[in-house]
Amino acid sequence: MKILMLTWEYPPRVVGGISRVVYDLSRTLLKDGHEVTVVTYKEGDAPEFEDDKGVKVYRVNNYMINPNNFIDWIMQLNFNLVAKASEIIATEGKFDVIHAHDWLVAYAAKTLKNSYNIPIVSTIHATEAGRNSGIHDETQRYINDTEWMLTYESSEVIVNSNYMKNELQRLFGLPYEKINVIPNGVNMNLFNGIERDYNFRRKFAMDNEKIILFMGRLVYEKGIQYLISAMPKILEGYHDAKLVICGKGG
């Protein structure tokens, strides 16, 4: 299967978790025998094209007269993504499916779908309402509406938890059978052969104590506040538990 990945971030550009998800997913799909092409934003000195161990990666510039307007910047990026994808289709043939990652590439995905009759599969990594506990201004409303449009235009929608599945159904009225729960994968080979460093561990807890480790951005949507508020209850059952938080933000 020929798969087109549309994403606004791909290594070396890392804004959040989408970059790593698309990177790992693309390489895994390639190993399963699929042909994967990524079209993304070019940041800094990243090459406009590279063959990343079999994954074809195309990066587009996104010059803007008024770069301070994020929505305009995103719309210009979508225009450039469409132009690059159309160029690839003209030289290498049509893709079998478009995999769009979040609202940031929604209009590019929709345009390519309608222009070339290519189905969309979208992954919704988070929602604007979920990030902000509701919709409070016009920018958030625009993003929320774009998320709805992407899920409407998609043949299938992917989320990584049942919580997100319920959230999409509640926010956008999607039929349950259209939403597929596929948790983000973990490459366990990365942990093979790693020796435990007990001296490092002792910086945070004694040998007989349990460690609860949180790793992630320290922002509301990651839910670290719930873990912190739950600690008194956890300590009732596990008196020797320690919570270690690693991340940036706040």
Predicted feature locations:
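A short helix/loop element that forms part of the nucleotide-sugar donor recognition site in Leloir-type
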Residues: 192-205
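Glycosyltransferase donor-sugar binding loop
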Residues: 186, 242-250
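Nucleotide-sugar donor phosphate/pyrophosphate-binding loop at the beta->alpha transition
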Residues: 118-121, 129-149, 170, 196
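Conserved donor-binding/catalytic core segment of Leloir-type glycosyltransferases
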Residues: 4, 206-222, 228-231, 244
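Short His-centered aromatic/hydrophobic patch
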Residues: 100-105, 124
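Carbohydrate-associated surface elements
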Residues: 42, 163, 185
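A short, charged, and often flexible helix/loop element on the N-terminal side
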Residues: 55-86
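N-terminal subdomain of nucleotide-sugar transferases
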Residues: 1-46, 50-56
